[in-house]
């Protein structure tokens, strides 16, 4: 570039920074723009691996959707617990007015430090989310759920009134405002969403999510979570087998699957994942119903092996570290393993 053009560009860059603030424009090579994306662990080792970067990306929008009782809120509370372990601040915008603080505490959430809002309208919920993001002092904001973000006009109207497209317009406008602030403040914003059926569809997938198409475009990561079976102890159901598909991923290759157990009153079973992933990677030997590690039997049946790892956290952490190393998640191991060890 000749000298005159260089001077003109330097003057333009200086004017932009003066008018819009430092960092409003930059060269990709000058700054930490090209640095690795920071991630927040989901609390599920398998899902962290499937996401490719060791968790959910900071400074991005994430959508978690699935049928009722599939584990959507459990997964987001698990993310909040992981963020709090690292000293971060989390906010939960409970548009459904359904958050159970006792359950959240059982999943490891520090309820006394959790910011919670139960807004009356969709506009209020999204305005609160935007203000929290703009403050730059909140690390994770969860909105539960998009389906419950009812526009003010609908709340104030009559029961039978038609309000076509109001919610979709509300989401589209809010996401346009939110996106730039989220990136600038490096906040992780998670939207929980529900599934609806398209009526009269002859071909293709009849399932869709609520709130229009805007969230599908603005979300960097979309997770489809499903309950695939029940975990039983005798006749008693103690948890659910869960599968998560990474439907969209702008920060790593998409379409990967993760499977884990959600135990009632405990949340995601870390020990269960260590056993499954350990067997897959041949770190744990399985012969019949017996599980062994380094030639030593650790339990007959998955429940007993899980109990052994719970009682011996040093062995669980050792296998965890090997799984992370094999999956190139060594950095994530450094941030999560010590915290989990201290919890045992």
UniProtKB/Swiss-Prot annotation:
Keywords: ATP-binding, Cytoplasm, DNA damage, DNA recombination, DNA repair, DNA-binding, Nucleotide-binding, SOS response. PANTHER family: MITOCHONDRIAL DNA REPAIR PROTEIN RECA HOMOLOG-RELATED (PTHR45900:SF1), RECA (PTHR45900). It comes from Methylobacillus flagellatus. It is found in: Cytoplasm. One of its GO terms (biological process) is DNA recombination. Coiled coil: none annotated. Belongs to the RecA family. Can catalyze the hydrolysis of ATP in the presence of single-stranded DNA, the ATP-dependent uptake of single-stranded DNA by duplex DNA, and the ATP-dependent hybridization of homologous single-stranded DNAs. It interacts with LexA causing its activation and leading to its autocatalytic cleavage. GO terms for cellular component: cytosol. ATP binds at residues 66-73. The keyword DNA-binding applies. This is Protein RecA. Signal peptide: none annotated. One of its GO terms (molecular function) is ATP binding. It holds the Pfam family RecA. SMART domains: AAA (SM00382). It comes from the Bacteria.
